[in-house]
């Protein structure tokens, strides 16, 4: 009997413990449910925040797109204003007299330019002046059709250019030309290379200006011929270079010369008519240079011409 009571007491104790454990498990389960509910709430909040962030990101992208569009429009307006400003500067520095049709004048951003004139007396002529060119008291006259004149960037030029009957005149980069300069053409080409130094009152006459005939054949005998001045040539003051002449790179033409025959590269020529007085020379724009290496441009051309 005593044993049964003891077993019964033990069973009751175990049952009590099981109930306690069950109560604890229920409590834990309740806590887990609470945590799960909180996690779901947090997850919902995170999803809401993520949705808001996506909405904000979308709005920011839209704003960024609008800003880019506005920036593009502002750049376009700025470009137009610069173009208008360039045209106004060109109009301010050039007077244009167009007496034909199909004529074109393209002008870049000029430097310190004033009192220039362009006159078109014909059709389909073209004048192109590139950026950073300094034009002062320059007159360009087109006579007839299909003439072409181009002045490359970083050049400085004064004087008169007359292009006649399908002629072409090209002036290279960084070339400087003094006042009183004159180019006369007639169905021919005049080319001045890069880095040339042309003094005041220089005349390049590719045409005699008026025809001369043989009285027996009755045919013209003085047709115009091309003039070519290569890059890096120094032409002194009051020089006249006549039709058909070519002057080689690195050469110098002395004061007051009349050049009727070709001058090779790296030669000094002078006189009337000009003759070669010294070979194997090269000049420098820098007046203080004592060696070829003292002038970068001179050194560069010397290397090219002697390699």
From Swiss-Prot:
Record-listed E.C. numbers: 2.3.1.136
Binding, acetyl-CoA: 208-210, 237, 243, 261, 278
Disulfide bonds: none
InterPro entries hit by this protein: Hexapep_transf_CS (IPR018357), Hexapeptide_acetyltransf (IPR051159), Trimer_LpxA-like_sf (IPR011004)
The keyword Repeat belongs to this UniProt entry's keyword annotation: yes
Result of changing residue 210 to A: Loss of activity
Single GO MF annotation: polysialic-acid O-acetyltransferase activity
Subunit structure: Homotrimer. Hexamer formed by two homotrimers.
Family: Belongs to the transferase hexapeptide repeat family.
Protein name: Polysialic acid O-acetyltransferase
Record organism: Escherichia coli O1:K1 / APEC
